[in-house]
Amino acid sequence: MGMEVAAARLGALYTTSDYASVVSINLFVALLCACIVLGHLLEENRWVNESITALIIGLCTGVVILLMTKGKSSHLFVFSEDLFFIYLLPPIIFNAGFQVKKKQFFRNFMTITLFGAVGTMISFFTISIAAIAIFSRMNIGTLDVGDFLAIGAIFSATDSVCTLQVLNQDETPFLYSLVFGEGVVNDATSIVLFNALQNFDLVHIDAAVVLKFLGNFFYLFLSSTFLGVFAGLLSAYIIKKLYIGRHSTDREVALMMLMAYLSYMLAELLDLSGILTVFFCGIVMSHYTWHNVTESSRVTTKHAFATLSFIAETFLFLYVGMDALDIEKWEFASDRPGKSIGISSILLGLVLIGRAAFVFPLSFLSNLTKKAPNEKITWRQQVVIWWAGLMRGAVSIALAYNKFTRSGHTQLHGNAIMITSTITVVLFSTMVFGMMTKPLIRLLLPASGHPVTSEPSSPKSLHSPLLTSMQGSDLESTTNIVRPSSLRMLLTKPTHTVHYYWRKFDDALMRPMFGGRGFVPFSPGSPTEQSHGGR
């Protein structure tokens, strides 16, 4: 009898829990729909964009739930860095690589790497050293050198979504490629830095530890990139050889999606950077795999990846806004509100300084290597690049949760203050800086200060070769590529020279093996039948 009562109670509890989950999911999906509708209606608004709209809706929903539960809870779901890194981040980063305009991205690759990798390292050291000097004297709690270095990595991760939503990549392709490319490389570098810090004993730092740390950092960077390229090439080879689309377009679309996700998860399994892996997987897939599938699959994959990325981004901002008011996080820091506000202000100031510490000096160095005036970064563009990296987003929150939480919510004052301070910086920078982005860009770039109303990327961007000619069309042939005549040309115009040898290598070896535009052998019923028939 007792067992039957216990089983009945357990069943009732399970049913109640199940019902609550279904209600939460329904409400969250409804909120996502509201974010999309309101974001569309406010598209022309001077101050608000879709990201800020989702954040505001999340905050308002959190307030309503907080009032309805009498201060016990403010969220439908608990923020989980696992949910963020495993399910939400992969489609966003993959689509960034898949839809990127490769002509501009690789044309400015050295500058992007300079800002995204070297610049992030400068920002990391600036914020870390300042945090050690300032916070160690403020009696925050039991924070050590490793925690302060982690703070540097956490607040070096930018979120340039607000700026990218305002910039038009057709009107300002150079600036857009710099902001976009730096944002992706920055996130990858910050996460690689953060993960590398967890593998070392940072209590006793000497030259050997620093060298080992740098070696581990470059190993993660290069290995992750190689894995992404390998996964993209493997998908291209399989689809090209099997001609899956001849029998089922669903299978080739599914294979592209699953192999892209597999590359990310495999990188995480091997303790590499999933962001770098899936980003370069997206670039390689758009260069080879996408041209090996049928025309209907090309349209499907292009819009499917863009839609998944858009939903994930909206989900993230809604998620962050709703979870920001979680009472369980704030109650441990509530007895020191002044100190929490002071730390948030200091961190915000360090973000501003750390960003300026590399944007303007590195822009100056980059301009020294450029001959053409249109390739140099003007001071107005430098201000936009600096501003674009001031916002902090879900990456910073996820890393902060990973570092400063224990068993869900921390009981330590120092850790609690760092969590709440991170949330404060993210909310303030996204809301305040984000609202000022449109007016600022309209002031600095009046000719291109109109909201982007087009699709995330035009079909043309998916046809562009991996490295295209500097002046020509994305679809041009290789006949107009000038062969470099001397070592001097290699030194003075390295991009053109690398482009020439890359195209020779790509045409001779890569495309015959992995496919790509115009280089897949004709076979009746194959994905290239239509393209050959139209010639």
Swiss-Prot record:
Residue numbers spanned by region Disordered: 452-478
Protein's name according to its UniProt entry: Sodium/hydrogen exchanger 1
More about this protein: Plants overexpressing NHX1 exhibit improved tolerance to salt stress.
Residue spans of biased composition, Low complexity class: 454-469
Induction behaviour: Induced by NaCl in roots and shoots. Induced by KCl in roots and shoots.
Record function comment: Vacuolar antiporter that acts in low affinity electroneutral exchange of protons H(+) for cations such as Na(+) or K(+) across membranes. Plays important roles in the transport of Na(+) and K(+) accumulated in the cytoplasm into vacuoles, and is involved in salt stress tolerance.
One GO location term (cellular component): vacuolar membrane
Catalytic activity: Na(+)(in) + H(+)(out) = Na(+)(out) + H(+)(in); K(+)(in) + H(+)(out) = K(+)(out) + H(+)(in)
Residues in compartment: Cytoplasmic: 1-21, 68-75, 136-137, 195-218, 286-304, 366-381, 437-535
GO BP field: positive regulation of response to salt stress; potassium ion transmembrane transport; regulation of intracellular pH; sodium ion import across plasma membrane; vacuolar transmembrane transport
Mode of membrane association: Multi-pass membrane protein
Species of provenance: Oryza sativa subsp. japonica
Keywords for the protein's UniProt record, in alphabetical order: Antiport, Ion transport, Membrane, Potassium, Potassium transport, Sodium, Sodium transport, Transmembrane, Transmembrane helix, Transport, Vacuole
Key word Transmembrane helix present: yes
Family of the protein in this entry: Belongs to the monovalent cation:proton antiporter 1 (CPA1) transporter (TC 2.A.36) family.
Compartments where located: Vacuole membrane
Membrane-crossing residue ranges in chain numbering: 22-42, 47-67, 76-96, 115-135, 138-158, 174-194, 219-239, 265-285, 305-325, 345-365, 382-402, 416-436
Source domain of life: Eukaryota
Location, primary (coarse class): membrane
Vacuolar side: 43-46, 97-114, 159-173, 240-264, 326-344, 403-415
Gene: NHX1
InterPro entries named in the record: Cation/H_exchanger_CPA1 (IPR018422), Cation/H_exchanger_TM (IPR006153), NaH_exchanger (IPR004709)
A GO MF term: potassium:proton antiporter activity
